[in-house]
């Protein structure tokens, strides 16, 4: 259902904007409260996107690509760029174009096109870069956990394309680089884990320093690395047996651990070594470091906690009070790893499975800036890890569509400035006239590096309107244009360039706000506010997210609501805004704002996924969907409210990170008595089966795979549902509830009380 809505709303372009018409002055834009922003899924799949087997024509002044909005003079064979109005001549190979013979990029319906670019000359004729995976495995785990991780790795290696290059690093107290090309026996290069090592030291120790390294050349020769390097990176078809044998022999870290102490785990050194190895072998080629980590780093750079078990891992309170002694130093270290990986064009994927925290909060900068995947689970044996890890390497419809080595560039009409981006990207520091002075997220640029991206990757770009008073935007042309140019390497190694050009209207909101109101996208606005709040919580000391959200909601309702002064009962909201207060109510209660129920690792995990998923997925994170199943009616959406609970109903809650199947009291009793096994109760068996099938469909289509919880009313796991419901019935008004329903033991305000307070504050003189 959500996916259908998403397809309809994003269309061929994969772009959703908070406002689909823009006020033509900076002052009027600031009164809109919700920022001018666009959420783009740069490589989202769509059946109608044409693939053109040539390179695009670019404007010689602003570098925008030729598009359907350009004015074309077919007689003079020239086109006028809609961004800078530069007149550009068509090259000779376009001489046959006419009104009836258009190239693909000029068809009005093709506002998004994809170009197939020739491979770089350095790679040799017609050859493409194979994908590269360096697996980094933590061995400081109990035997059972290590076996789960090794089993997952073996399965992954079997699923890789035959030409994919594979490397392997294991670590515990020390980091071990395995020379897979030395098949006669197991050959390992050992790095001490207790101190930081430079990139040059890593290369010298591996025998890749100086003359043995290909200085600065891009990509592998003939599709594979040179002879000095294929010691460590081999095609999957050649090293599968060696690697499987190595994994069979691999044991838990043998270094002794004192009683009452944690294992000595050198995560930082292991990731440094993996990054250095890839930087020497394959700079500028699509490659991923896939790290499987089972506990906190306690040794060397990136340490997050001491070895003494009596010292707890940092909490949100510790971070707020600046009482986490290792935190800032670890973040600084991972920031340096992030910069190195971004320069090389490589990705860090993190699979963290442990009951304790492992340092996701510190590693967030390296994972997010490189566009890496992140999965957090309790065990390597848990379905959340096992199924998610398998999905990364699968082909077919379930494939994530992992792509490499991308860049996103934005061209925009004059008078529009780019403030920055939130999401899995890193600024390329490309300055220009379209770059704003104020910065949000990854700013000071009009281009970003996307080392890793997939079919659901979504970035939020923030815009501002030029403050120059002499020239009002929209005076000469009532339309403005934004162009998103995304180049990337697909899983087959081809380089593609996707060009999306969107056109929107300028309006004078000071004269009439009706068009502005009709162009408001409530879902996108809620997601953008959530991402902005999350960024501010991380970067601004003492930031109160709840108060900030409340103030902005009050300002928005004051601006766009209809009411009489000091008369709360008169307040009404236009249907284009009517769902927004509900989104903010649920956002205030969500794990993104109420962080003290979670560890810093969990909060970092939730925020990374919030920042990278498409709008429909992010909306479910903020406001879960609830479906009800009963004998009386087919499955239908239900209010996210405790009043939806009934003894004779089954509820299916999709909260994105978890999916809950909740059986009412009567349903649970009948199931326990085995009625569904009796032929005369076929309808009951079908009722039990329907939410199970729907929940499995959600689990199959989502990445990371959500936690599936099956529970009964009044059972211990019912809390997974109750925590997400509007507490319209609490212990304070339980006597008003109908039989078979439920109450929530909380002092939180309900949506109704929240809305009443909002009305009072909005209408105040």
UniProtKB/Swiss-Prot annotation:
Keyword hit for Nucleotide-binding: no
Function: Component of the coat protein complex II (COPII) which promotes the formation of transport vesicles from the endoplasmic reticulum (ER). The coat has two main functions, the physical deformation of the endoplasmic reticulum membrane into vesicles and the selection of cargo molecules.
Record SUPFAM superfamilies: beta-sandwich domain of Sec23/24 (SSF81995), C-terminal, gelsolin-like domain of Sec23/24 (SSF82754), Helical domain of Sec23/24 (SSF81811), vWA-like (SSF53300), Zn-finger domain of Sec23/24 (SSF82919)
Stretches for region Zinc finger-like: 59-84
Binding annotation for Zn(2+): 59, 62, 81, 84
Keyword line: Cytoplasmic vesicle, Endoplasmic reticulum, ER-Golgi transport, Membrane, Metal-binding, Protein transport, Transport, Zinc
PANTHER family: PROTEIN TRANSPORT PROTEIN SEC23
GO CC annotations, alphabetized: COPII vesicle coat; endoplasmic reticulum membrane
One example of a Gene Ontology biological process annotation: intracellular protein transport
Any one GO molecular-function label of the UniProt entry: zinc ion binding
Family under the similarity heading: Belongs to the SEC23/SEC24 family. SEC23 subfamily.
Pfam families for this protein: Gelsolin (PF00626), Sec23_BS (PF08033), Sec23_helical (PF04815), Sec23_trunk (PF04811), zf-Sec23_Sec24 (PF04810)
Main location: membrane
Membrane topology according to the record: Peripheral membrane protein
Subunit-level organization: Component of the coat protein complex II (COPII), composed of at least five proteins: the Sec23/24 complex, the Sec13/31 complex and Sar1. Interacts with SEC24A.
Protein name from the UniProt record: Protein transport protein SEC23 E
The keyword Endoplasmic reticulum is assigned to this record: yes
Localization: Cytoplasmic vesicle, COPII-coated vesicle membrane; Endoplasmic reticulum membrane; Membrane
């Amino acid at each position: 259902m959500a996916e259908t809505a998403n397809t309809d709303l994003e269309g061929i372009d994969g772009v959703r904007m908070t406002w689909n018409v823009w006020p033509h002055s900076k002052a009027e834009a600031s009164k809109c409260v919700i920022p001018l922003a666009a959420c783009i899924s740069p490589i989202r799949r769509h059946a109608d996107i044409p693939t053109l087997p040539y390179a695009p024509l670019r404007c010689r002044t602003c570098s925008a690509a030729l598009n359907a909005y350009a004015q074309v003079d077919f007689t003079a064979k020239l086109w006028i760029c809609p961004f800078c109005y530069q007149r550009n001549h068509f090259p000779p190979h376009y001489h046959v174009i006419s009104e009836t013979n258009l190239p693909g990029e000029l068809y009005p319906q093709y506002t998004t096109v994809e170009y197939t670019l020739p491979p770089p000359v350095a790679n040799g004729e017609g050859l493409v870069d194979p994908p590269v995976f360096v697996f980094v495995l933590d061995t400081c785990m109990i035997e059972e956990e290590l076996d789960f991780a090794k089993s997952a790795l073996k399965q992954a290696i079997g699923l890789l394309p035959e030409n994919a290059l594979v490397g392997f690093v294991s670590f515990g107290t020390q980091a071990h680089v395995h020379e897979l090309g030395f098949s006669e026996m197991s050959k390992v290069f050992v790095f001490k884990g207790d101190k930081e090592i430079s990139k040059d030291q890593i290369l010298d120790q591996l025998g890749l320093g100086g003359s043995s390294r290909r200085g600065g050349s891009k990509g592998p020769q003939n599709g594979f690395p040179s002879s000095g390097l294929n010691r460590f990176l081999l095609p999957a078809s050649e090293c599968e047996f060696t690697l499987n044998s190595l994994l069979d022999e691999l044991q838990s870290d043998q270094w002794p651990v004192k009683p009452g102490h944690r294992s000595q785990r050198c995560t930082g050194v292991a990731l440094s070594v993996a990054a250095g190895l890839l930087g020497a072998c394959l700079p500028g080629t699509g490659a991923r470091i896939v790290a499987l980590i089972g506990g906190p780093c306690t040794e060397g750079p990136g340490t997050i906690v001491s070895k003494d078990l009596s010292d707890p891992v940092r909490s949100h309170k510790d971070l707020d009070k600046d009482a986490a002694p290792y935190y800032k130093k670890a973040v600084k270290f991972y920031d340096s790893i992030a910069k190195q990986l971004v320069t090389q064009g490589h990705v860090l994927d993190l699979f963290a499975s442990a009951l304790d925290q492992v340092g996701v909060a510190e590693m967030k900068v390296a994972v997010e800036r490189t566009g890496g995947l992140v999965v957090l689970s309790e065990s390597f044996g848990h379905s959340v890890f096992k199924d998610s890890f398998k999905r990364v390497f699968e082909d077919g419809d379930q494939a994530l569509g992992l792509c490499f080595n991308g860049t996103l560039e934005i061209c925009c009409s004059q008078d529009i400035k780019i403030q920055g981006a939130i999401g899995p990207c890193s600024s390329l520091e490309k300055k220009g006239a379209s770059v704003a002075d104020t910065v949000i997220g990854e700013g000071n640029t009009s281009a970003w590096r996307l080392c890793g991206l997939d079919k659901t990757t979504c970035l939020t770009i923030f815009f501002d309107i030029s403050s120059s008073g002499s020239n009002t935007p929209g005076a000469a042309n009532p339309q403005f244009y934004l162009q998103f140019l995304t180049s990337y390497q697909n899983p087959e190694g081809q380089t593609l360039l996707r060009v999306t050009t969107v056109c929107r209207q300028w309006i004078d909101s000071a004269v009439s706000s009706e068009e502005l109101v009709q162009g408001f996208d409530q879902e996108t606005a809620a997601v953008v506010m959530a991402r902005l709040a999350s960024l501010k919580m991380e970067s601004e000391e003492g930031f109160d997210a709840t108060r900030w959200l409340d103030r902005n909601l009050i300002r928005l309702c004051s601006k766009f609501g209809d009411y009489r002064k000091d008369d709360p009962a008169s307040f009404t909201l236009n249907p284009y805004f009517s769902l927004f207060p509900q989104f903010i109510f649920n956002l205030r209660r969500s794990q993104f704002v109420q962080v003290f129920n979670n560890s810093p690792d969990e909060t970092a995990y939730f925020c990374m996924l919030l920042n990278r998923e498409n709008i429909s997925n992010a909306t479910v994170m903020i406001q879960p969907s609830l479906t009800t199943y009963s004998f009386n009616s087919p499955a239908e959406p239900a209010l996210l409210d405790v009043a939806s609970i009934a003894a004779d109903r089954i509820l299916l809650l999709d909260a994105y990170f978890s999916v809950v199947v909740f059986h009412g009291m009567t349903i649970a009793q009948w199931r326990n008595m085995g009625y569904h096994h009796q032929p005369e109760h076929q309808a009951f068996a079908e009722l039990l089966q329907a939410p199970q099938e729907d929940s499995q469909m959600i689990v199959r289509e989502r990445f990371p795979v959500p936690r599936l919880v099956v529970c009964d009313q009044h059972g211990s796991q019912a809390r997974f549902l109750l925590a997400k419901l509007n507490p319209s019935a609490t212990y304070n008004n339980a006597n008003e509830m109908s039989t078979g329903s439920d109450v929530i033991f909380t002092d939180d305000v309900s949506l109704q009380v929240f809305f009443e307070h909002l009305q009072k504050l909005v209408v105040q003189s």
